[in-house]
C-alpha cells in the first residue's frame, strides 16, 4: 500500500479519509488502507467535528504534478537530439495524467513510433496514425523490429517490470539508450535499470518535446516512422494470410478469427477485457491487427 494508518480519534475520520483518498490518486496511483478500531466504529460523532481546529479543503482537487528539473530534462532532450531512430513506449502514467492527446500530438509532430505497454488501459485508438501496436517482442514482431533497430527508447509513465524484462536484453538491446520518464519518485525507483531517468509529469514532458520541436531542436526523419508502419502492415497481412490458410478445409473456428469477430462487433463505448492462456494470446494478436 502507498499509505496505511489506524484512526485513534473519531473526530479525525474525515481528515484521514481525505488524506488517504488524495494519496491513492496522486503520483503513482495505488491502494491505501485505513483501520478503524471497533470502539470508534460504533461511536457517534458530530458531522462538523474537527472543522475548526483542523481545517482543510474537503473538495476533490487535481493531483499535484511533478515538473522536470531543467538540468535533468536537458539531458533527455540532448539524447533525443542525437537520436536517429527513437521509439516511445507509453504506460499507465499517461492514462492517469489524462495526457493521451498530447502523446498523440508528439507522435504526429516528431514522427516517433508509439507503442502501448501490453497491459493496463489503451492510450490511443487503433486507427491513430502514430500507434504501432503493443510493446511485446514475443507476440508482435513489429515491436521487436523497432526495439532492435532503435537507438533511443523512451518509456513514459511505465515500469520496467517482468513484461519489459526489467529493462534488460533481449527486450531492450544493449545497442540502445533507455530513458524512463515517470511522474512520481516511487515509480521512478522501479526503473533504476534505465540508462536515464526523469521525474516529470507525462504532460509536462510532452510539452517540452513539442517546444523543442517548435524551436527545431528535435527533428526526426520520417523514413524511420514510415518503416515502422510498413513493418506493421507486412505483419498484419501475414497473420491474416496464415489464419485464412489454416481455416481452409476445416470446420473448426480458428481462435484468431473468433478474436477478430468479437472486435468487429464492438462499438466505441464498449470495453474489451482479456486475460489467461490462449484467449489472451490470440486476442492480443487481434488487437495488434485492429485498425490497419
Segment roles from a protein language model:
Residues 230-292:
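Active-site diphosphate/adenylate-binding microenvironment
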Residues 1-2, 49-61, 125-126, 233-246, ...:
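Gly-rich Lys/Arg/Thr-decorated short loops/hinges at beta-loop-alpha junctions or inter-strand turns
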Residues 18-23, 49-51, 100-111, 168-173, ...:
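Short, solvent-exposed amphipathic alpha-helical segments in soluble enzyme
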Residues 1-16, 36-38, 120-228:
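Glycine-rich, acidic loop regions that bind phosphate or pyrophosphate groups
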Amino acid at each position: 500500500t502507498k499509505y496505511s494508518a489506524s484512526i485513534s480519534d473519531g473526530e479525525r475520520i474525515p481528515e484521514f479519509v481525505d488524506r488517504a483518498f488524495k494519496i491513492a490518486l496522486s503520483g503513482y496511483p495505488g491502494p491505501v488502507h485505513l483501520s478503524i478500531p471497533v470502539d470508534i466504529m460504533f461511536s457517534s460523532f458530530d458531522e462538523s467535528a474537527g472543522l475548526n481546529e483542523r481545517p482543510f479543503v474537503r473538495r476533490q482537487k487535481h493531483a499535484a504534478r511533478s515538473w522536470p528539473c531543467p538540468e535533468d530534462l536537458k539531458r533527455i532532450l540532448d539524447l533525443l537530439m542525437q537520436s536517429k531512430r527513437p521509439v516511445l513506449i507509453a504506460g499507465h502514467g499517461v492514462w492517469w495524467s489524462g495526457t493521451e492527446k498530447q502523446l498523440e500530438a508528439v507522435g504526429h509532430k516528431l514522427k516517433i513510433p508509439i507503442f502501448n505497454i501490453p497491459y493496463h488501459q489503451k492510450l490511443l485508438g487503433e486507427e491513430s496514425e502514430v500507434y504501432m501496436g503493443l510493446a511485446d517482442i514475443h507476440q508482435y514482431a513489429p515491436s521487436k523490429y523497432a526495439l532492435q533497430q532503435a537507438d533511443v527508447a523512451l518509456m513514459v509513465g511505465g515500469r520496467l517490470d517482468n513484461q519489459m524484462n526489467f529493462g534488460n536484453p533481449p527486450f531492450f538491446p544493449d545497442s540502445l539508450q533507455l530513458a524512463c520518464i515517470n511522474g512520481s519518485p516511487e515509480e521512478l525507483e522501479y526503473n533504476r535499470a534505465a540508462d536515464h531517468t526523469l521525474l516529470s509529469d507525462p504532460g509536462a514532458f510532452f510539452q517540452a518535446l513539442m517546444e523543442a520541436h517548435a524551436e527545431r531542436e528535435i527533428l526526426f526523419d520520417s523514413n524511420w516512422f514510415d518503416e515502422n508502419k510498413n513493418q506493421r502492415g507486412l505483419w498484419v497481412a501475414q497473420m491474416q494470410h496464415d489464419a485464412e490458410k489454416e481455416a481452409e478445409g476445416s470446420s473448426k473456428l480458428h481462435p484468431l478469427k473468433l478474436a477478430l469477430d468479437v472486435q468487429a462487433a464492438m462499438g466505441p463505448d464498449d470495453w474489451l477485457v482479456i486475460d489467461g492462456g490462449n484467449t489472451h494470446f490470440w486476442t492480443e494478436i487481434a488487437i495488434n491487427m485492429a485498425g490497419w
